[in-house]
């Protein structure tokens, strides 16, 4: 049981920033999240972005949720697509995750980066898992949009590394050594 569970004051709690937005950013910076790359076919080829907001919602039918910043150059392609692909990344895909987090995302003519699913959709074979989805709903909230999507197909990749997580503005690998017993 932690100190908080026992009604005691936590021993290592830093004072919260005085500004709510700064405190919010600090709280979520300290909260690790799995890393995904979300792609869709755009008018100029596949477009994509890195997201740490992907979460499972339901099993039958399989539904997931994520949010994206509408300021992202790839957001319009994803929001306008009838299907998109969510790539759950592992540590072997950290360079791809970094590239999709910036403006230098891989182009379609880069060898070995892209492949096509039997449906014709582009995907990243370096991902741990590939989930082909169709949007069920979108909800704009300020400069973000929350997307709820049904998973249509799944391709499980070969194990090429430990899960990739984002924590304190950096990518980390979640290894077997990090398991708590």
Segments predicted by a language model, with ranges:
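Basic, polyanion-binding surface patches
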Residues: 2-181
């Amino acid at each position: 049981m932690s100190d908080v569970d026992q009604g005691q004051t936590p021993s290592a709690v830093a004072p919260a920033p005085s500004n709510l937005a700064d405190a919010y950013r600090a709280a979520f910076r300290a909260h690790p999240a799995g890393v995904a790359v979300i792609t869709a076919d755009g008018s100029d080829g596949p477009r994509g972005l890195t997201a740490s907001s992907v979460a499972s919602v339901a099993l039958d039918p399989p539904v997931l949720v994520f949010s994206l910043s509408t300021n992202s150059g790839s957001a319009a392609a994803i929001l306008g697509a009838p299907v998109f692909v969510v790539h759950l990344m592992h540590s072997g895909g950290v360079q791809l995750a970094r590239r999709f987090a910036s403006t230098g995302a891989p182009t379609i003519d880069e060898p070995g980066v892209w492949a096509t699913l039997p449906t014709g959709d582009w995907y990243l074979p370096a991902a741990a898992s590939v989930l082909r989805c169709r949007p069920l709903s979108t909800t704009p909230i300020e400069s973000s949009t929350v997307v709820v999507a049904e998973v249509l197909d799944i391709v499980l990749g070969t194990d090429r590394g430990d899960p990739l997580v984002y924590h304190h503005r950096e990518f980390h690998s979640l290894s077997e050594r990090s398991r708590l017993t």
